[in-house]
Every structure is written in structure tokens, then in C-alpha cells.
Design a protein with these regions (language model features):
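Conserved short alpha-helical segments that host acidic/polar catalytic motifs at enzyme active sites
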Residues: 2-143
């Protein structure tokens, strides 16, 4: 999941494509920033160093941005056991990101907006943060 924008991405699309490793480029299906960001993050070591890969990819895409807002994003991804999420904006206006543990469902949800009436149970992820959710354990690190 990715929500956000890269200022001037239409002008930086080719440069972003060039950052995707050859072995991963065959998986590129569209021309959107989310897909390029994810493939570059995979090339930056997302499978073995999620926080490092996201931090490196954010820095790379922030440098590609040519217009204001330079870079705004939230993302969430999983290896099937651990859920990861990130929230970041170069201008302090990051898209919203919330998480919540459900005792009933025995799982965690990460969403851009709370989807039920029990808003008090949702916790907002701070801007410039990387999250690791493993069952009920929550670790939030500043990016």
C-alpha cells in the first residue's frame, strides 16, 4: 500500500525507472510512482533491511522531486509475518496513517483513515516514522 505524491514525478519517471535493478524491472507494469518506489526499495534491500531500504529510497525519490510538494508518502508492506509501515513528508504534511490491534480479529490493521466508529482505538503514526508491527508488539523508529 502506498499513498502520497512525488512533486514533478512525470518529469522524473524515466530517472526513477533507471533506478530499478534489471532483475526487478520485468515486474514493472505501470508508470506510477508507487510501483517505482516499491521496486527501488526492493533493490535497496527491503527484504533484509526494511528500515534502511525505505530510508535510502525516500532520500533517492526526494532528490528526484522537482516541484513542491517534494515528497509525501505513507506505505505499508509485509513479509507474511511482520507488518511494516512508513509515514514521511519533506514538507511536514504527510498523508495520514493509523494502526490498531483488534483483540477480536487477533490482528493489526494499518490504514490511511480509520474505517469504523471506534476512532479512539486508532493510533496515528507520527510523520517521519518507520513502524514494525509483530502481533501485539509495536516498534516506531524515527526516519
Amino acid at each position: 500500500m502506498h499513498n502520497g505524491q512525488i512533486g514533478g514525478f512525470e518529469a522524473a519517471c524515466k530517472a526513477a525507472d533507471m533506478l530499478i535493478p534489471d532483475a526487478l524491472y520485468r515486474h514493472r507494469r505501470g508508470a506510477i510512482d508507487s510501483e517505482a518506489f516499491f521496486l527501488v526499495a526492493l533493490g535497496n534491500g527491503l527484504a533484509t533491511d526494511p528500515i534502511g531500504a525505505i530510508a535510502r529510497t525516500i532520500a533517492t525519490f526526494e532528490a528526484l522531486a522537482t516541484k513542491t510538494p517534494k515528497f509525501r508518502m505513507t506505505s505499508a508492506f509485509s513479509d507474511g509475518k511482520i507488518l511494516y509501515a512508513a509515514r514521511y513528508a519533506s514538507d511536514g504534511f504527510a498523508p495520514t496513517l493509523y494502526h490498531r490491534w483488534s483483540t477480536l480479529q487477533k490482528g493489526r490493521a494499518v490504514v490511511s483513515e480509520p474505517f469504523d466508529a471506534v476512532c479512539g482505538l486508532w493510533q496515528e503514526v507520527p510523520d517521519k516514522s518507520f513502524c514494525v508491527f509483530e502481533r501485539q508488539r509495536v516498534q516506531i523508529t524515527t526516519l
